[in-house]
């Protein structure tokens, strides 16, 4: 076989959201820091080529992420990783952190200790502490101490043709989110509304990014609203969430970074205090436990330290390869499954 590139992927999902983990064949990524490596993947043609190799057809699909496992830059970390999605490489993700932790332990790359194993993960957004509950060689659950999360703006407003004036919060939880109370759109978060929520989320994200500029004060490589997360409250008090993602799909998990950003807004409004915890449910009913571990500051701004607890499950392992003579090897997309956003991808 005439393969010029080959990588091994462990198939993992966290509460329904796919987060494949590249455990072998990952090339060296240039950069002195993980943030530098993130920047390279998003700006260098070779970085874009690597991302397209993994996330576009014929090897990829619009759903899920691929996590590149990398050597840690920080001596305190056990491993580093960067999240690859069709739109770009991303700095941080709660569900993907749980997938990576599960992969590291269940593959034996990091020795599993029972009943508890601590894994330090390095992301472009900072260190994430993962505490895995382990039993009989299985990773039962993972609790993440997320990066400090903060509010950029509460009750921002944007005028829309479809829904009139929409209020939203801008907050950071590892990436920037626009957090929208879903009932403003006349919708509820349930599986039957997934397509309508996606269409609304993608429209709002585009309009917000055109009008508002957000940049992390300490990490310039993290800028712009990455996702719109719709939120609601279930009758039992659980937070119901739906994060909308490029090219036009919903997060199957409750979303760790989105809940971290939302936690910052809840604290800013006086609705939670250190030591509090609550359930967050996704559009398919899967759950995270969200906790407020403590308070801190980021560049002089008040910030919260969130915890997220969820489960990861391995479901397969496979290899992907590139035939040097394959005319479609660089990847391709079509609007039938990728939607109109397919036309914006530069192959």
UniProtKB/Swiss-Prot annotation:
Reaction(s) catalysed (UniProt annotation): trans-4-hydroxy-L-proline = cis-4-hydroxy-D-proline
Residues forming the catalytic site: 93, 255
One Pfam family, short name: Pro_racemase
Keywords: Isomerase
An annotated Gene Ontology molecular function: trans-L-3-hydroxyproline dehydratase activity
Top EC class for this record: isomerase
EC numbers on record: 5.1.1.8
UniProt: substrate binding residues: 85, 94-95, 251, 256-257
Domain of life per record: Bacteria
InterPro entries assigned: Pro_racemase_fam
Matches recorded under PANTHER family: BIFUNCTIONAL TRANS-3-HYDROXY-L-PROLINE DEHYDRATASE_2-EPIMERASE (PTHR33442:SF5), TRANS-3-HYDROXY-L-PROLINE DEHYDRATASE (PTHR33442)
Family: Belongs to the proline racemase family.
Stated role: Catalyzes the epimerization of trans-4-hydroxy-L-proline (t4LHyp) to cis-4-hydroxy-D-proline (c4DHyp). May be involved in a degradation pathway of t4LHyp. Can also catalyze the epimerization of trans-3-hydroxy-L-proline (t3LHyp) to cis-3-hydroxy-D-proline (c3DHyp) in vitro. Displays no proline racemase activity.
Protein name: 4-hydroxyproline 2-epimerase
Organism of origin: Allorhizobium ampelinum (strain ATCC BAA-846 / DSM 112012 / S4)
């Amino acid at each position: 076989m005439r393969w010029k590139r080959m990588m091994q992927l462990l198939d993992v999902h966290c509460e329904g959201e796919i987060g494949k983990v590249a455990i072998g064949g990952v090339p060296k990524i240039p950069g002195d820091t993980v943030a530098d490596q993130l920047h390279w993947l998003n700006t260098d043609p070779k970085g874009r080529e690597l991302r397209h190799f993994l996330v576009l057809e014929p090897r990829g699909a619009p759903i899920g992420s691929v996590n590149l496992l990398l050597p840690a830059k920080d001596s305190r970390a056990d491993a580093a990783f960067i999240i690859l999605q069709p739109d770009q490489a991303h700095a941080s993700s709660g569900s993907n952190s749980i997938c990576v932790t599960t992969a590291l332990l269940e593959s034996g790359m990091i020795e599993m200790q029972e009943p508890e194993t601590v894994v330090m993960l390095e992301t472009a957004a900072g260190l994430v502490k993962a505490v895995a509950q382990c039993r009989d060689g299985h990773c039962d659950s993972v609790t993440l101490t997320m990066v400090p999360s903060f509010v950029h703006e509460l009750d921002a407003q944007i005028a829309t043709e479809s829904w009139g004036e929409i209020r939203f919060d801008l907050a950071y939880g590892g990436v920037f989110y626009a957090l929208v109370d879903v009932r403003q759109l006349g919708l509820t978060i349930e599986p039957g509304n997934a397509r309508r929520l996606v269409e609304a989320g993608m429209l709002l994200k585009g309009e917000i990014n055109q009008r508002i500029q957000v940049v992390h004060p300490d990490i310039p490589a993290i800028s712009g609203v990455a996702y719109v997360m719709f939120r609601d409250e279930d009758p039992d008090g659980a937070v119901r969430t739906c994060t909308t993602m490029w090219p036009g799909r919903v997060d199957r998990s409750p979303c760790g970074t989105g809940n971290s950003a939302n936690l910052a807004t809840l604290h800013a409004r006086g609705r939670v205090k250190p030591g509090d915890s609550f359930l967050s449910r996704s559009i398919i009913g899967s759950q995270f436990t969200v906790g407020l571990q403590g308070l801190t500051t980021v560049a002089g701004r008040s910030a919260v330290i969130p915890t997220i607890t969820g489960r990861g499950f391995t479901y397969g392992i496979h290899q992907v390869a590139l035939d040097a003579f394959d005319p479609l090897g660089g990847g391709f997309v079509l609007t039938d499954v990728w939607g109109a956003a397919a036309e914006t991808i530069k192959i």
